[in-house]
Amino acid sequence: SIINLSELNKGLVLVTGPAGSGKSTTLACIIDAINRTKEKHIITLEDPLEFLHRHKKSIVSQREISSDTESYVVALRASLRQSPDVILLGEMRDFETISIAMTAAETGHLVLSTLHTQGAANTIDRIIDVFPPSQQRQIAVQLSSVLQAVVSQQLIPGTDGESLIPAFEMMTATPAIRNMIRENKIPQIDGTIYSSAAPNMFSMDTSLQKLYQAGKISADAALAHASNPEMLKRKL
């Protein structure tokens, strides 16, 4: 269901998690799926460039922020003049970058980016909190209309003692979720994800439970990375 995000034509998709959790790999997989299946103009803005994409069905222009341009804001503004369909933004570091990214998503581009947050509710709070208080209401309304999905991920030590297994949470912006963002009921989002039975909406703890049941991670590892260890312990 995460790869299915490549089917989107517009809006904002965020992949979040701590440093070294594999966010760049997840985004590269989504970009590659678009590149293989659609005729699009894709621009990637990264610091540093981690994955090189060859042209397949799409045209992919890759810019390294440190060597090709002076900042994400400058690079993002320049990229919008080149008629991209898809923009991969390595990181959203400040409110100016976030603001331009949201406007790009609003005007018909698919914008993919990352944040160092864990969980959808924390991510949404973080974006809104970056802005001055006087703008936060307007940003919440804008975010509620442009956000398509938030994927959170972490890498869990595998039972073989060597591998690291990715575990994911996925929030899809349903009408109910959009309403929660708009009405500042963000704390309710985690509960909605937790209780969802939809294939494109699942909690981190559901992922951990499935990985444990498949024998890929230990119970201790699952509980150490859980959002709600007490509840997960009962399920294991």
Segments the model singles out, each with a brief description of its role:
Residues 1-236:
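Short, flexible helix-loop junctions that flank or precede catalytic/ligand sites
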